[in-house]
Amino acid sequence: MFVHGVNNRKEDAGFDNDVARKKEFLKTLLAAPLGLDPAKVHISFPYWGGDGVKFLWNQVSLPGGGYETLALGAQKNEIDLWLHEVQQSFGAKSVILGKVSRDQSFADAVDLIWDAAAATANSPENIEKIAAAYQASQRYIEKYPAPAWALKAEPLSNEEFLDALLRGIAELPADEKKLETFGLSGWLASTKEALARLGSAPADATTAGLLALGRKSAHQKASRFLGDVFVYLKNRGTAAAPGPIVRAVLQAFRNADAARQEGDDKLIIVGHSLGGVITYDILSYFAPDLKVDYLATIGSQVGLFDEMALYSRPLPPGMPTDPKNDRIAANPNVGKWLNVFDTNDVFSFSAEGIYKSVKDFQYDTGYGGFGAHGGRNRHIDEHRFRIHGSESRSDRRRDACPLDRLRRVSEPCGCGIWKPAVSHVAADLRGRRR
């Protein structure tokens, strides 16, 4: 199950595609590596955004906003902002894949290709094709971690770099999946266009426009973020009479619990942002009887809410008397709890200092603000997450956990940080099956 966070509305452009991305990723990651039939894996996305904040004056309170609203999630805006953020994160107006290969790693350059493909994906069918192509590229990287064509002193153009990669994949041994099965025509042209733009320096006027768009997007998303939090706290209700958001999510939890079957007997809940808070509130107060095998809270404020004593479940009397050592006891209905936080995300918090039962993992998306929190970053980089904590960009692939290659499974999603925790859950489940 995936419980979304703030700033999710069905009417927003790209909402359905984002759900499709997550569904494809979860099926691929949790089913295939465990030897399960993806058709048997029940995946649920409880939607509560419709009961979130409503702005009575259509956000006219936004500075300079008038009555105009920004089309959050509009694909052109999202692609433009992604391009700008990548260029900013690399400290250059243009990003050349061949130079990334030389200065950092071939694998990092390939990641950017699939970031671009994910940002331009416009249908569930294309998402599946990109996922298959991504997996093939990881097999190519395993065989050729530093191909000569990718490290030329005079680098290929970004479009030529992609063509060379696809040719290399096509030349893999016969037992590897062949490129023809990927249906390249559905997404290749738009990916090449995005990569060409990534490799060219934008005009100053374009940069100024993107900065203005980014500021407006961040302001509008911040108001929704605060609004969704306030509305949840105001309307969550009680155990006897839960509010609309709690009812919707809890019913989805109950349905998933009832749907357990042979070959699909684990209840795994991933809660992003406020979705993690809602999930913890439900499991600790509204439904303490509901047994959950794995809980992953991603980019969430679970610990912060307990620091402010905002949960329906009251803290034990006198807790904490010694903040350095006192920890809240484990929820008996939760088997294993992982909390992933991004060092660049101001809305993402650790949890180990407050709870006994949780394992924190630090992850660096390389993006800041709402890009890190999940507003725009469609990364396919869960393999960059390391069980042993954070690491520099140049170290991300060295001495990796042996299960990293298992976890390199594509899913061009709407949030770059939740995938690492799901990946670790899959790896842990696989280990328990052995």
Curated annotation (Swiss-Prot):
This is Uncharacterized protein y4kF. Keywords: Plasmid. The lineage of its organism: Bacteria, Pseudomonadati, Pseudomonadota, Alphaproteobacteria, Hyphomicrobiales. It comes from the Bacteria.
